[in-house]
């Protein structure tokens, strides 16, 4: 594998382990030329459905777009990169399991929101505000109220 830092072709695998609920192999590599380390992921490549956008155009499913949108929603939140990768892997699995050749962008957005809801409620609200195009504060209040109804009552923390 080529080093991303110096572009040298000779790198060694330092460590390998299964990650993302068994969906990928995480490898730590070291470049023999510049001695820098980097991480690679090896995963099975499967044919995911095409994404049908709101305007009717079609595009290939792009895992990087899903990861980027989740990272943006999770910015400065205490969620590990592995948790994001696992969430995206679950989305991909759901899409593959559906057996559909196409998925509407709205459905994909809902899958992302479901995963964010499990990872971090703040990120969920951030993503929902953009995805659902919130126009005023009352829409934020509605989502927050939804969480309050769904969450069991918590006892106040002592300070």
Curated annotation (Swiss-Prot):
Is Magnesium among the key words of this record? no
User: Which keywords label this protein?
Assistant: ATP-binding, DNA-binding, Metal-binding, Nucleotide-binding, Repressor, Transcription, Transcription regulation, Zinc, Zinc-finger
In this chain, the unnamed zinc fingers fall at 3-34
Describe the location of the ATP-cone domain by residue ranges: 49-139
One term of GO molecular function: ATP binding
What InterPro entries does the database record attribute to this sequence? ATP-cone_dom, NrdR-like_N, RNR_NrdR-like
Q: Coiled coil where?
A: none
The cofactors named for this UniProt entry are: Zn(2+)
- Per UniProt, what is one Pfam family of this protein? ATP-cone
* Note accompanying the cofactor annotation: Binds 1 zinc ion.
PROSITE patterns, alphabetized = ATP_CONE
Q: Name one GO biological process term.
A: negative regulation of DNA-templated transcription
Top-level lineage group: Bacteria
Main function: Negatively regulates transcription of bacterial ribonucleotide reductase nrd genes and operons by binding to NrdR-boxes.
Protein family: Belongs to the NrdR family.
Give the protein name, as stated in the record. Answer: Transcriptional repressor NrdR
Q: Which organism is it from?
A: Burkholderia mallei (strain ATCC 23344)
């Amino acid at each position: 594998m080529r080093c991303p830092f110096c572009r040298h072709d000779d790198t060694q695998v330092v460590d390998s382990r299964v990650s993302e609920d068994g969906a990928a192999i995480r490898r730590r590599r070291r470049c023999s030329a510049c001695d820098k380390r980097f991480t690679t992921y090896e995963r099975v490549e499967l044919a995911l459905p095409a994404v049908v956008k709101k305007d009717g155009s079609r595009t290939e499913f792009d895992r990087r777009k899903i990861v980027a949108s989740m990272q943006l929603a999770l910015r400065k939140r205490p969620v590990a990169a592995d948790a994001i990768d696992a969430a995206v892997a679950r989305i991909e699995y759901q899409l593959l399991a559906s057996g559909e050749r196409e998925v509407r962008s709205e459905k994909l957005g809902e899958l992302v929101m479901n995963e964010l809801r499990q990872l971090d409620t703040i990120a969920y609200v951030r993503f929902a505000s953009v995805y659902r195009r919130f126009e005023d504060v009352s829409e934020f209040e509605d989502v927050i109220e939804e969480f309050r109804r769904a969450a069991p009552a918590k006892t106040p923390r002592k300070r």
